[in-house]
Amino acid sequence: MSDNKIKLCALTTISKTMDWFIVDNMRNLAKNGYEVTLVCNMDDGFAERNQDYAKCINLPMSRGTSIGDLIKMPWKLYRLFKREKFDVVYYTTPNVSLYAAIAGWLAGIKCRFYNQCGLRYVSFDGKKRTIFKAIEKFTCKLSTTVREQSPMNRQFAIDEGLCPAEKISVVGIGGTIGVSLEQVDSFDKNEAKSTLRRKYGIPVDGFVYGYVGRVNADKGINELITAFCQLQKKHDDVNLVLVGMLDDANPITPENLQIAKDNDHIFLTGNVPPSEVYQHMSMFDVLTHPTYREGFGKVLQEAMGVGLPIITTNVPGPSEVVENGVSGVLVKDHDSADLLEKMELMYQDAEYRMSIAKAGRKRAETYFDRPIMLNNILEDLNKTLGV
């Protein structure tokens, strides 16, 4: 350790993931005696936003499957790890986690810390599922420490044989960095709602179902568009707002993408920076998040903080963030009919919406406020390192 500081290298495949899930944690670690290096495929401005507390290294790599990256990246990271002599390599997202686990093991890094945020192989079938499950198991094997995002996902990983129980655990009751209630409470939500609805051409008095995240198949967007179009036949004042980038690696069907572009009541905002997420959520009347799989659901915690009623799926992660019928409503995954039924319920019952929203905010205050989450991570890492 240099100058009594713990040298930590945090890695994600792309910088958007780093921005959304990692940088607040790394900034907190830097304040508490860690020497931090950030490695990812950086977008413009990433280094400038984070260089006040961390060394930033741009490492271009692909999000999708790439044989070229599989050959090159472990070697590049190995040389970086040997040169910098990190005490900890801390990796998140599938591709870079595989590369970093290999490189860290070869370089003799004593703490190889894997944040297992959702298991992509569960959405695959046949040989593809077998291959990607083997990759996940290999990444876990080369890691010294694995942190899963929820208790149910942890148990699933153990049951699937990905990782022995003694190597994998959950920080707090789950999640990553939670929601900044300080930021949520720092702006006028009614003003943000009217301003952003005007910006996107959304009726100010319309009823809005909203989604935040990558617009892809695994997030249940095909089912969401299908359910919304059915609901729209009954209620002409409903709208659907999809906040996030279109995901070419796991796209929705061409038919649904065309529907989203042609329907005057569906709005695609594109990606927005993390600093604007809470304001965009203020446009919504209900958050709809019909994902197939999830680590824990940071966006659900954020929606709770903003005071939104939530519809999400009964899968590991989301079903642990919300209490069904109390702080959220659970639906079956891959089921547009069940989703439609719950969207109709939320539309019809204002009192129920308010009850769900109030309970969700209280739950966010108790478990998911960012200072609580960041302190949990710091204590867990210090305990892991014996400091």
Annotate each predicted stretch with a short phrase:
Residues 324-325, 329-336, 345-350:
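Conserved acidic donor-binding segment of nucleotide-sugar-dependent glycosyltransferases
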Residues 292:
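Aromatic "clamp/platform" in nucleotide-sugar-dependent glycosyltransferases that forms part
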Residues 44-47, 143-183:
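A short, active-site helix/loop in glycosyltransferases that binds the activated sugar's phosphate group
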Residues 300, 309-312, 322:
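Short hydrophobic beta-strand element within catalytic cores of glycosyltransferases
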Residues 81, 271-272, 279-284:
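Short alpha-helical donor nucleotide-sugar binding micro-motif in glycosyltransferases
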Residues 40-44, 175, 212, 239-252:
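Glycosyltransferase donor-sugar binding loop
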Residues 253-272:
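Nucleotide-activated donor-binding/catalytic signature segment of Leloir-type glycosyltransferases, i.e.
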Residues 19-24, 207, 211-230, 329, ...:
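A conserved mid-protein helix/loop that constitutes part of the nucleotide-sugar donor-binding site
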